[in-house]
Amino acid sequence: MKICVFDTETIDLEKCFVYNIGFCLFDTETAEIMLKEEYVIEQVWHNTALFETAYYANKKDYYSQCMRGRTIRLEKFGYVTQRMYRLFKEHEVTQAYAFNSPFDERVFAFNCEWFKCINPFDNIAVHDIRAYAVEYIGKTEEYKKACDENQWYTEKGNYGTTAEIFYRYIMNDKDFIESHTALDDSIIETAILLECIKRGAEYGQNYEVPKSLARTRTQMLEVYHNGEIVYERECNSIYKRQIKDTTKIYLKGE
């Protein structure tokens, strides 16, 4: 079976004009990437005011160098969608995967409507690699231990569930930094998906997508009466910054 793993880079999260698309065609029988392509979208690239609002506009020199070296092609959005559509048909692709796929699906839907182009994913089932990773990697005690050892936490103190952190873990590379370019990200996300398959996941599944991977911790519960401890025990609780390591309860009266 041939599947597509893809990624998009957009100017922002709301007006999601796409400026970079990368994808791999992956053979599930040989576990090898058989084709990979990357494009910068001409309509956004040449709109200087629009492109310079992009999250990663500082990568413009990088994209320029890649286009000069012909490792990335500058093409109109419609060309890219037609190219993907033809490749999917040629290789009988019926499944696609992306990390946090609802966002990338929204990107294609928005841009296809804006530019009046065919959506190559209209008849393709798209599955979320993040859901796979949380289910088969993130919920393991080994992964949580690695997060604790390396402080791989979110701003709210939960366990990290980004592609960057999952890739650090499976490759045992604590210094890995995600490039946030579409093809490179597609390649590392393919590796994450393959690791999940090795751990027992099945292609074509829609695993539950949690908003976060909650972190638990041991907390002391102490009950006081007339200034003395009358009960204490250890308990597990969901980590929250505002909760102290020890909870004290004071009983009134005799």
For each feature predicted by the language model, list its residue ranges:
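Short helix-capping/linker segments at secondary-structure and domain boundaries
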Residues: 31, 138-144, 196-204
